[in-house]
Design a protein with these regions (language model features):
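Gly/Ala-rich beta-loop-alpha elbow adjacent to hydrolase catalytic centers
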Residues: 1-9
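Catalytic histidine neighborhood in serine/cysteine hydrolases
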Residues: 104-123
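Catalytic active-site module of serine/aspartate enzymes centered on a nucleophile-bearing elbow/loop
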Residues: 127-150
Length: 150
């Protein structure tokens, strides 16, 4: 997945996944809804997030019955056994590359990391297609095999 898709698959990583899931690929995923909203408010919109955090959380609870702070990729990755490859553009101004480093540190499963210099949000493949493809091929060569259930 890319961006929100990356975050979705990383959050799913903490679930009991079926044995046919041999790996997870995440490109420029963020750590939580609250974390990305805070970053966007502060760095992109240049407004304080403070009280808006509580408002956003309340809106989430009312609309989807889940709080904006309830789930995070960091927590999910502490419980995964599925190999993960994390990719991020070093010059991403929408989702900070530090979030991928947080995810990488939290991940307890076998993991690979590719940071692409000069790439903005979701542009890693387009900046370095050969490097990206080689990293993905190497990842699947290592981990694309049946795994034991933990």
């Amino acid at each position: 997945g890319v961006s929100m898709g990356a975050t979705t698959v990383l959050m799913a990583a903490g679930l009991q996944l079926p044995p046919n899931v041999h790996g997870i690929m995440a490109d420029c995923g963020f750590t939580s809804a609250n974390a990305i909203w805070e970053h966007i408010a502060k760095d992109n919109l240049h407004i304080r997030f403070g009280i808006r955090s509580a408002i956003a959380d309340r809106m989430c609870r009312r609309k989807i019955q889940v709080g904006s702070k309830e789930h995070s990729t960091v927590e999910a990755l502490k419980h995964t056994h599925v190999p993960v490859i994390l990719v991020h553009g070093a010059d991403d101004h929408f989702v900070p590359v530090e979030m991928t480093y947080e995810n990488y540190t939290a991940c307890t499963a076998p993991k690979d990391l590719l940071i692409v210099p000069g790439a903005d949000h979701g542009m890693s493949y387009f900046m370095e297609p050969e490097k990206y493809e080689n990293a993905v091929k190497a990842f699947w060569a290592k981990y694309d095999r049946p795994r034991c259930e933990a």
